[in-house]
Regions:
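N-terminal nucleophile
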Residues: 1-148
């Protein structure tokens, strides 16, 4: 069954955003990579500002999608900057992902979180699986948004 899953879905990105008791935010991303990939290829996950970014003045962001396009537009950093300038994390993520789509036909997904605990799971891909835990409550559907 694991081989079937891998052959259909490949190695997917796992991302996380978190907030501590003092209101500091953090983001992390890990990826199985794009297949087939060139030897030495580095995707967006380890690139700060590309696929992962966190700034207490804006928001924490973890991205998934075609890394080269995400890096080229520094999407995670852009989302945080829009948030810092006053947009909600949902509006900030939507604006940045739409710019990526319109500018270079880049498709991506993001999870975002700011210091106030406002979060968003958003994507322009065919699908994106995500979840959110706040305390002992788990939420997904009310904040999961697809942009076209």
């Amino acid at each position: 069954q694991a081989r079937l899953y891998k052959s259909v879905y490949g190695c997917e990105t796992v991302g996380a955003v978190a907030i501590d008791l003092e209101g500091n935010i953090a983001a992390g991303s890990s990826t199985g990579g794009f297949s087939p990939m060139l030897p030495g290829r580095v995707g967006d996950s380890p690139i700060i500002g590309g696929g992962t970014y966190a700034d207490n003045r804006g928001c924490a962001v973890s991205m998934t999608g075609l890394g080269e396009k995400i890096i080229r537009c520094s999407v995670a950093k852009e989302i945080s900057t829009f948030s810092e300038l006053g947009d909600s994390v949902s509006i900030a993520a939507g604006k940045a992902i739409m710019r990526l789509l319109k500018r270079i036909d880049g498709r991506a997904g993001a999870i975002t979180l700011n210091r106030d605990g406002e979060y968003c799971l958003i994507h322009s891909t065919d699908f994106m699986v995500g979840g959110f835990i706040k305390g002992k409550k788990m939420a997904v559907a009310d904040q999961f948004k697809r942009v076209l």
